[in-house]
Amino acid sequence: MAYLSFKSNMERTPRESNTPCPPPQPSPSLFSSLPDDIVLNILARISTSYYQTLSLVSKTFRLLILSKELDMERSYLGTRKPCVYVCLQSPTHPFDRRWFGLWIKPYDHQPLTHWTIDIKCTGHWLLPMPSPYSRCLQIVHETVGSETYEIGGQNMTPSTDVWVYDKLIGKQRKAPSMMVARKNAFTCVLDGKLYVMGGCEADESTHWAEVFDPKTQTWEALPDPGVELRYSSVKNIQTKQGKVYVRSNKKNFVYLIKECMWEVAEENLGESTCEIENVCYCYSNKRYWWYDAKCEEWRLVKGVSGLYEYYKTDSEIGNYGGKLVVFWDRAVSRLTATKEIWCAMISLEKGHDGEIWGHIEWLDAVLIAPRSYALSHCMDFLQ
């Protein structure tokens, strides 16, 4: 199990002798003398779990590891693998977010037929993502066609900058700037347009939300959603039936595109959502649901009812290589200032009856964190 610590536990030991050490012998820098394209090809074949260490070798390595060229090379070689990150957020400081990546011990998983609290440790952990990786995760990414948009400043200060990376030609360019500076904004794509909301001052009523049209390369401000939404804590944004839904800690809202107006959403949006193989899943009312597009209704994921009795708090869900990954927290004791973050991996299968069945592969405590920090959301992609 990993531990969330904000202080380094590395201590230097004093030298036992005053004898000066001989100067280190210069080592041949054969690897660093290679052309960048050769280095990128080599790095693309290495597991991303080593990137954090390699980024400390030199500034050149760090820039290459964080570059879009490396991402393109991994896509070309087919070495990208699914990954999922979970965010822990301070309730008193909304922008104090700590990112952790799920590290899974490589071995063959067998679905659990029965399990109790005293499950054998699986060796899976949530590992902290140090700077600059955690900052990169907080930069908003959204894909429209073959283009990936980056919204927000690299140094995590509010910014109007928008960068576009075209996977087809492998080049990056700067897009027209937003109308207001943002950081940690929420985005979604609907009908080929990019919607951006929040991430700015709550009193920014004119441009709290705006939409970008890639065809005309223009930004347009959306109507003011009102004080109640602007001053609430936005949880996520999702699209459904040609509408944009915003879930907050107070109420749920919907933006009606054709009418150009905001309304309070009466329907249940789910507390956490993700998409797996073109099927939308959500966690709501202590249950896991999937959306049947043909019947236009939410249906229960079957086979995972035992998981419902295992925790009392809300959970966050994500997509890990086609499997449903679930995170929740569990208090160890009322007397302690820490709590456990638990994780479950669920494989999914559609039965002959048209229902989706889940099979719990494993679950375990993967992190010990300060009790004051709350699970915010998951982010999943190929890395």
From Swiss-Prot:
Write down the SUPFAM superfamilies for this protein, in alphabetical order: F-box domain (SSF81383), Kelch motif (SSF117281)
Q: What is this protein called?
A: F-box/kelch-repeat protein At4g19330
Q: Read off the Pfam families from this record.
A: F-box (PF00646), Kelch_FKB95 (PF25210)
Provide the residue intervals of the Kelch repeats: 147-192, 193-239, 272-318
The UniProt entry, under SMART domains, shows: FBOX, Kelch
**Keywords recorded for this protein, A-Z:** Kelch repeat, Repeat
State the protein's purpose.
Answer: Involved in seed germination.
Q: Name one GO biological process term.
A: seed germination
The upper taxonomy is: Eukaryota, Viridiplantae, Streptophyta, Embryophyta, Tracheophyta
Q: Please indicate which superkingdom the organism of origin belongs to.
A: Eukaryota
Keyword rRNA-binding assigned to the entry: answer is no
PANTHER family, A to Z: F-BOX/KELCH-REPEAT PROTEIN SKIP4, GALACTOSE OXIDASE_KELCH REPEAT SUPERFAMILY PROTEIN-RELATED
- Identify the stretch(es) annotated as Disordered: 1-27
User: What positions does the domain F-box occupy?
Assistant: 28-79
